[in-house]
Amino acid sequence: MTSSSVLPSTAAQIVQSFLDAFARHDVEAAVAAADPQVTVTVHPLGLHATGPEILKTVLTDLVRAFPDLMISVSRVIATGDVVTALFKAEGTQAASYAGAINQEKHLDIDQAWRFTVSSGLITDVSAYWCQAQLYRRLAVKRYDEIAIA
């Protein structure tokens, strides 16, 4: 290893490298920061599962539905091995997402993701955002008629 190829070592650096990869739409690089037994919880979607394939699906669905997705990180707060990232996700819908059919609406939504890092890998990801706000931004008129995609 050369001095110019420094790997992230602190929990905050590991999470920042995940977020940087996600912002570049490099899902493979983002998922590479996760432990093989990573626990993934996406509270607004009612998702709670284990494994990097789940994380890959969550990220891929976002990038697919919003191909111009921009992730603007406002804060990364580290407390030991737990890191919270606050960011805004922005983009124009180009495919169905979370049951909302594509109406080419612009989405901008604040999110908070909590990560736990152990032995240099992300072992837990919990994502939070206001699902009602997401549906309003995507022009869903009736929540009882969400299309399951």
Language model features with spans:
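C-terminal and inter-domain tail/linker signature
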Residues: M1-A149
